[in-house]
Design a protein with these regions (language model features):
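Short, mixed-charge aromatic SLiMs
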Residues: 19-27, 67, 104-111, 156-159, ...
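Alpha-helical recognition segments enriched in aromatics with Gly/Pro capping
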Residues: 1-48, 55, 171-173, 177, ...
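Generic recognition of stable, solvent-exposed alpha-helical segments in well-folded globular domains
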Residues: 14-18, 23, 35-39, 51-59, ...
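Charged substrate- and nucleic-acid-binding regions of tRNA-handling and nucleotidyl-transfer enzymes
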Residues: 142-212
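Generic structural signal for hydrophobic core residues of well-folded globular domains
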Residues: 3-4, 44-47, 64, 80, ...
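Structural motif
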Residues: 30-36, 68-76, 156-164, 177
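Small-residue-rich helix-loop
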Residues: 53-158
Length: 212
């Protein structure tokens, strides 16, 4: 609609009903129209974030793996909504929830777990500490806020910056350097899957630090 037409104001976001009311064919100008794909993506993201979690979950159903049940899909929507530009983006963002532990572990190399300010040996110690923290949380208490509080405390005790401490955890748990919010993701994965994936990462790190 904005290719050749303007509402005469700075407004950019309209519902279809609002456009139908405001649009005038006589105000369409010929020539000079430029299709801005980046702007379209931005507007699409705005519309996505305006949806309720329930509405977005319904729209995402055909874009996410069939293995992700409706309850889990609705639970992950709040974690990914702000990151979505297009509905199709959701598939990659939620894949870690349905991938096997082996597939997740196969997505990264040992050195990808290591923050820039640390060595592989130091990272192994930090990740082992993170595992101990998670193992100390009962399954019924395995919630985002509790996990974040305990992990931040552990990072401080080790003298690690939170971002550095969280990096190997994120990659171990999701197989990716970029993912939905870490602690919400951990809550959805559950205690046992988190522990299993960190164990797999520790095994990979042990090979990295083992003497030749």
């Amino acid at each position: 609609v904005f290719l050749g037409w303007s509402p005469g104001t700075e407004e950019e976001i309209f519902t279809l009903d609002e456009l139908a009311t405001r649009f005038e064919i006589t105000e369409v100008h010929k020539g000079g129209a430029v299709f801005d794909a980046d702007r379209l993506d931005y507007l699409n993201g705005v519309y996505i974030r305006a949806l309720t979690d329930e509405q977005l979950a319904l729209r995402l159903r055909s874009f996410v793996p069939d293995e992700l049940d409706d309850r889990s899909l609705l639970a992950v929507v709040p974690l990914i909504k702000e990151r979505l530009v297009r509905l199709a983006d959701a598939s990659e963002l939620v894949a870690f929830l349905v991938e096997s532990d082996a597939i997740v572990a196969g997505r990264y190399l040992p050195d990808e777990l290591v923050p820039k300010r640390a060595t592989a040996e130091e990272t192994a110690v930090a990740l082992a500490r993170a595992r101990d923290v998670l193992a100390g949380v009962a399954a019924e208490d395995f919630a985002s806020a509790e996990l974040e509080s305990r992990c931040r405390t552990a990072a401080e005790e080790l003298g690690w910056k939170p971002g550095d401490f969280f990096k190997p955890m994120r990659i171990a748990l999701t197989g990716r350097a970029v993912s939905p919010p870490l602690f919400g993701s951990m809550e959805l994965l559950g205690r046992e899957r988190c522990l299993a994936r960190i164990d797999a990462a520790l095994v990979k790190l042990s090979r990295e630090v083992a003497p030749a």
